[in-house]
Amino acid sequence: MKYLFYTWKLGCLLLLILAGCSSKKSVSSYHSFESECLGVELDGSETLRAWGRGKNRTDAIEQAKKNAVRDVLFKGVVAGSRECSVRPLITEVNAQERYASYFNDFFRDGGEYLKYVSMEDKKTNSNMKTSNKTQISYSTTVRVLRSQLQQKLIEDKILKP
């Protein structure tokens, strides 16, 4: 009887030790920060929800505009509605590096990319915000003028007609 009691006690102790050694389950949220298609207009422009990060709200929204144009140019828009073109405007491999001086100037603060971004479709309170200790992330609704952007790249001899 004593032997059975000690065996049972040892089994419970072993079970508690093993349960305490399990990895801790952390609760965290993951949010994809890639541009998402919301629709396409009849003029060929694409309405996107784009994310940007910055020190404050203004910086984050400007970065979101740059990210939207960059996604249309180099990555294509895969997430969201299937109306947007999955194919990027520039399909040439390493085009961003090859034409680095052109795109550095194009995407500088206050640069030419702003001519191809419109905030027409932005609705009141449509921004989403996440933050950590050092940066704020905002999403905003942006319309990228894809056909005008394509024409500009053809004129600048980045794309072939």
Which residues does each predicted region cover?
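Sec-dependent bacterial lipoprotein signal peptides
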Residues: 1-21
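Domain-level marker for long, solvent-exposed, non-transmembrane regions
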Residues: 21-161
